[in-house]
């Protein structure tokens, strides 16, 4: 469950290390984002030679949350951290590698490039 001012680790090699959620996209009064949702975020920590710089405002898709997500079959899935993958204007990932597992909900949200780059889809 991601809301405004939530800090997330970045699960790709775009150069950013940590982002802070500014806004959850999808509806005017939408408060929370979960796995597979797109957010607008500000880069808080970044590598000096990365593609993404500190202070940049980016779009990102949430790939892991500490708060459990209930699946249609009744099972729950939760992760050890809150993580996101930074997107470009075409909703494709900026990085070329994804670190750590991603939730299956990312596939249902049609982010197939992220699913194919991920080492594990849970």
Swiss-Prot record:
GO terms for molecular function: large ribosomal subunit rRNA binding; structural constituent of ribosome. The keyword Transmembrane does not apply. GO terms for cellular component: cytosolic large ribosomal subunit. It comes from the Bacteria. GO terms for biological process: translation. Keywords: Ribonucleoprotein, Ribosomal protein, RNA-binding, rRNA-binding. Transmembrane segments: none annotated. Signal peptide: none annotated. It holds the Pfam family Ribosomal_L14. InterPro entries: Ribosomal_uL14, Ribosomal_uL14_bac-type, Ribosomal_uL14_CS, Ribosomal_uL14_sf. SUPFAM superfamilies: Ribosomal protein L14. Part of the 50S ribosomal subunit. Forms a cluster with proteins L3 and L19. In the 70S ribosome, L14 and L19 interact and together make contacts with the 16S rRNA in bridges B5 and B8. PANTHER family: 50S/60S RIBOSOMAL PROTEIN L14/L23, LARGE RIBOSOMAL SUBUNIT PROTEIN UL14M. Binds to 23S rRNA. Forms part of two intersubunit bridges in the 70S ribosome. Belongs to the universal ribosomal protein uL14 family. This is Large ribosomal subunit protein uL14. It comes from Wolinella succinogenes (strain ATCC 29543 / DSM 1740 / CCUG 13145 / JCM 31913 / LMG 7466 / NCTC 11488 / FDC 602W).
């Amino acid at each position: 469950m991601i809301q405004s001012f939530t800090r997330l680790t970045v699960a790709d090699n775009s150069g950013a290390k940590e982002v802070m959620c500014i806004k959850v996209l999808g509806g005017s009064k939408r408060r929370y984002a979960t796995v597979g949702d797109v957010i607008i975020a500000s880069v808080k920590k970044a590598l000096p030679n990365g593609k993404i710089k500190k202070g940049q405002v980016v779009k990102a898709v949430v790939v892991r949350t500490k708060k459990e997500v209930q699946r249609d079959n009744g099972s729950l899935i939760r992760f050890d951290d809150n993580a996101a993958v930074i997107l470009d204007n075409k909703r494709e990932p900026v990085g070329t590698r994804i670190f750590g597992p991603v939730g299956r909900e990312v596939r249902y949200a049609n982010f197939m490039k992220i699913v194919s780059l991920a080492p594990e889809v849970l």
